[in-house]
Every structure is written in C-alpha cells, then in structure tokens.
C-alpha cells in the first residue's frame, strides 16, 4: 500500500480502518484530502500532513540492485495527487520527507547499507547525490505549488553508528546539498527535525538564531514568522510537538 500520510516507521495514524480504506484505493487528491482530514481530526493537528514517499517494497540485499533502489527513491508517484490535495485543502499543508541517507536506507537492508558504505563508497555517494538532487526538485515543485511547509528528517543518519567521517560524507553533506537547492517562496518554509539540525550545527554546517515568539501553536506560529520576516529554514524543535511552553524559534542559516 502506498501512503502519502506516513513514513514506514510512523504508521500509527494509518490504523484507522477508514483511512486505510481510502489509501487502498487508487490515489487521487480528493482521497488523500479525505484521509488527511480524518487523521487531522483524530490528532488535533493544526496542519494537514502528507508524506512525499510511498511505502517501499522489501529492501534490497544485493549491490546489483542499488540502481533499482535509487530509481525508486527518485520517483515520487504520489506527488501529483499531493499537489492536487494541497490545492483543495483550504488549510495549511505540511509535506514530510526523508533526507537522502534515510530515504535510501528505507530501500536497502540495513546491514548491507553500512557494509556498502565501506566497500563501495563511490557508488553509494553517487546514489545519494542523485537522491538529494531529485528529492530537492520534487520538494521545490511542491513549495512552488502551494505546500506551506516541508518537514525534513534524517532518522537513520546516526553519527554514533556511522562514525564521523561517514556521517559527514554520506548523510550531513547530502542533506546540506538538498537544503541548498530549496528556495521556499515568501510565507513557506523548510523545517528540520531537531536531531538533524543539531547535528548539522555541531559540525559547522549551519548556524541558528533564536527568535522569541508569542505562545501558541508552534507550526502556525512558524508559518506566520515565515510570512512576516521571510524566514525560510527553521529547526531545533519538533514540528509535531505543536503545543509547548517554549516560545523560542530557531531560524537556521547554512554555513557550508
């Protein structure tokens, strides 16, 4: 089943039988909108949340299948329906996506992935560069077509497992490459998962500026900040924790 509502590891919101029924049908913007609204009502979110990636098939186990995995990671069959859904929504829409390393990790056996980074570094770097370029293109199209917020996460990129050198080469550099290609229009923004943004800041890839905001819903306040001040990149907070006593926002700037 392809789902524009959740990552492979975030399927709880798709357990609703009606949501699953809608997503099992041929994908259209209206069906995605119906499913997204039902999820929104159940979670109380201020945003309609969609996901760029379709749920992948079984992960590959052979380096000979790497090209197939890359093609899958670079194809976004749900994008036309996502854009149609956003046009019909009449409410702020957040599009979730995974950074290049995690996007490929969804499609490769995890043990093989770490082994191939050591055995085939050039091939893996080239694969990740393609994913970064194509994903950035899809996300820019979404932003230009009215998506309000892109939420980027890199859950599989763990420096403590990859080691510093491989983390920088295969994860951090690829995410930075993708971010450099994104230019949200006024009022839209890119939001980085706090684990990813903190890791990049610690390695000098970006800097953060604290902005004090009024108490309220965090993602809505972030979109307001984007409209008023032209902020295009935020992080260091979880966009899914919508209500918090923390009124700080962190405007990010790439430094590499």
Q: Where in the sequence are the language-model features?
A:
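Catalytic cores of TIM-barrel enzymes
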Residues: 1-116, 121-256
């Amino acid at each position: 089943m392809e789902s524009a509502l959740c990552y492979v590891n975030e399927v709880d919101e798709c357990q609703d039988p009606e949501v699953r029924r809608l997503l099992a049908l041929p994908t259209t913007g209206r069906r995605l909108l119906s499913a997204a609204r039902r999820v929104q009502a159940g979670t109380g979110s201020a945003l309609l949340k969609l996901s760029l990636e379709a749920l992948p098939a079984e992960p590959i186990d052979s380096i000979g299948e790497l090209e197939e995995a890359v093609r899958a990671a670079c194809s976004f069959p749900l994008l036309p329906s996502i854009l149609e859904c956003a046009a019909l929504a009449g409410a702020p829409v957040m599009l979730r996506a995974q950074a290049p390393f995690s996007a490929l990790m969804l499609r490769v056996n995890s043990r093989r992935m770490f082994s191939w980074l050591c055995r085939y570094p050039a091939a893996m770097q080239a694969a990740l560069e393609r994913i970064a370029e194509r994903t950035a293109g899809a996300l820019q199209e979404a932003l230009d077509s009215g998506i309000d917020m892109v939420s980027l996460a890199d859950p599989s990129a763990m420096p403590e497992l990859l080691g510093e050198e491989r983390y920088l080469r295969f994860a951090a550099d690829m995410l930075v490459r993708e971010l450099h290609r994104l230019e949200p229009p006024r009022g839209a923004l890119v939001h980085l998962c706090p684990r990813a943004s903190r890791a990049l800041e610690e390695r000098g890839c970006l800097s953060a500026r604290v902005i004090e905001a009024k108490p309220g819903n965090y993602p809505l306040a972030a979109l307001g900040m984007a409209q008023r001040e032209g902020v295009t990149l935020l992080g260091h907070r979880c966009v899914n924790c919508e209500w918090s006593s923390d009124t700080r926002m962190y405007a990010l700037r790439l430094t590499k």
